[in-house]
Amino acid sequence: MIRRIESVLELHREEFKKEIIEKDSSFSDENIEKLFETDKEKALEKIEALKKRIKQYETNKLPFYNKSGWTLKSILAESTSQVETNFREYINSFSSNIDEIIDKFDYRTTITKVVKEKRLSSIIELVAEEDFSPKRLSNIEMGYVYENLIQMFSQDDAKDTGEHFTPREIIRIMVDLMEIDFDPETAKKAITLYDPACGTGGMLSIAKEHLIDKAKTKEGMKNTEDLVILNGQELLSQNYAVCKADMILKGETNSNITHGNSLIPDIESIEDDGDQHAGLHFDYMLSNPPFGVDWSEYKEHVEKLGTSRYAWGKVGADN
């Protein structure tokens, strides 16, 4: 996850660097190399000034950033005795939206465990050179990676949690059956899609992809990207973190992905986070909810919703 975020930031930094050089050619690699030959100190100052400008671009223009100046590669290049300290500084320097994702993954606790096993450097080394940029792996392909890893390490628990991943092919059929009324070329009004048990966000992402694929022009694609608003809620922290990260990295600034149990009310008397979309209305909804999961521990909370949501009755608490 961290390497994916870093890879996306690296692409943006390259773009920012090009913009800066177009405005001031003295920052080009060629001119800095020439400056090195005559005045090494000024050349180093120029490099630091360029880094500072790129960092300003990053924090001002992107919905997420890292203000530490570290990368996984540069952490490894420093003293081996400082790897943990520098890595923690790196992790703690992300913007608040990425920091929330790190928390949901319980990443800092994992770092402590890995350090105790003396494996932090080897794990960083394993991923630092990998190209996880969108140029090599699309967001959907990266979703496959996340889902396969989560499945691999949670298969024993999946039956109890209702955590099952819907194949992409099935999602596409579901989206086709919805017959969403939206013309990418002529639409003027936004439409909203909602998944109350969104997992890693596959259904929402593919639903939007499906509509983008209908566009015949670049304007139609842009129109769809702007007007199709994704909304979702997920109970399991890691799945929520993956979904949230995916939306941020894709630039889905209008999306509304929340964490909690969408089946219970969100009120102070209940410790768990409940429905974060109460009172909202959506144009279309699709989902693969956790069928067959025992919800007896939430029964009392569900009853508080009364007929407002479950007017037609409720299934047994063991299903």
Q: What are the functions of these language-model segments?
A:
Residues 288:
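Conserved active-site aspartate in kinases
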Residues 291-319:
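Mobile active-site "lid"/loop adjacent to the S-adenosyl-L-methionine
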Residues 122, 160-163, 186-189, 232, ...:
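Alpha-helix N-cap/helix-initiation motif
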Residues 117, 279, 318-319:
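Short, solvent-exposed loop/helix junctions and linker helices
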Residues 1-182, 256, 262:
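Non-catalytic, mostly N-terminal accessory regions of nucleic-acid modification and defense proteins
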Residues 164-284, 292-294:
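Conserved S-adenosyl-L-methionine
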Residues 155-160, 191-193, 225-230, 309-315:
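Glycine- and acidic
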